Each structure stands twice: as structure tokens, then as C-alpha cells.
Amino acid sequence: MADFEARVKEIIVEQLGVDPAEVVTGASFVNDLGADSLDTVELVMAFEEKFGIEIPDEEAEKIQTVGSAIDYVKTHVRK
């Protein structure tokens, strides 16, 4: 399968309109990348659509950094 990290970062850049250099593993969507609550919901929806997964609300709330998004996708996408 394609490199999940690169694909997740690409989605974040597209959704948030941020510089790719800012999208590092430890970056917080809200604190570092300037996302608001609507942006984070849209990010989760984009991950669901692009990777064909369903992210329950309680899990979505835990996805707050680039790294946590990558880890979630890697764990839940069928190989």
C-alpha cells in the first residue's frame, strides 16, 4: 500500500492550506496548524473518504496531531 504518512500529510496540507514544511509528526492541528473545530471535523471526514475507513466520534476526538492521524490510519486501513 502507498505510504500512509505522505498521504495523510497531503490531506492535511489540502484541508488546512498550510505549508507542507509545517506538517510534522508532532504538530497539533489546533495549536500549531491553526485549525478550528470545524477544520478538525473536515480533516477526519477527509481521512475517512480517502482511506475508506470509519472513524467513530470518540476516536476522532483523540486525533489531535499529525502523528496521531498517521498512527490511526496505519492501524485501521485494511492492508
UniProtKB/Swiss-Prot annotation:
Record protein name field: Acyl carrier protein
Instruction: Please describe the post-translational modifications of this protein.
Output: 4'-phosphopantetheine is transferred from CoA to a specific serine of apo-ACP by AcpS. This modification is essential for activity because fatty acids are bound in thioester linkage to the sulfhydryl of the prosthetic group.
Q: Please state the gene responsible for encoding this protein.
A: acpP
Q: Name one GO biological process term.
A: lipid A biosynthetic process
Q: Where do the TM regions start and end?
A: none
* UniProt keyword terms in alphabetical order: Cytoplasm, Fatty acid biosynthesis, Fatty acid metabolism, Lipid biosynthesis, Lipid metabolism, Phosphopantetheine, Phosphoprotein
Please describe what this protein does. Answer: Carrier of the growing fatty acid chain in fatty acid biosynthesis.
Matches recorded under InterPro entries: ACP, ACP-like_sf, PKS_PP-bd, PP-bd_ACP, Ppantetheine_attach_site
Organism field: Endomicrobium trichonymphae
Q: What is its main location?
A: cytoplasm
**Which family is annotated?**
Belongs to the acyl carrier protein (ACP) family.
Gene3D superfamilies tied to this protein: ACP-like (1.10.1200.10)
Kindly list the GO CC terms recorded for this protein: cytosol; membrane
In which pathway is this protein known to take part? Lipid metabolism; fatty acid biosynthesis
Give GO MF terms, alphabetically: acyl binding; acyl carrier activity; phosphopantetheine binding
> Pfam families under this entry?
PP-binding (PF00550)
Q: Which PROSITE patterns match?
A: CARRIER, PHOSPHOPANTETHEINE
Annotated ranges, domain Carrier: 2-77
Q: Which NCBIfam families match?
A: acyl_carrier, PRK00982.1-2, PRK00982.1-3, PRK00982.1-4, PRK00982.1-5
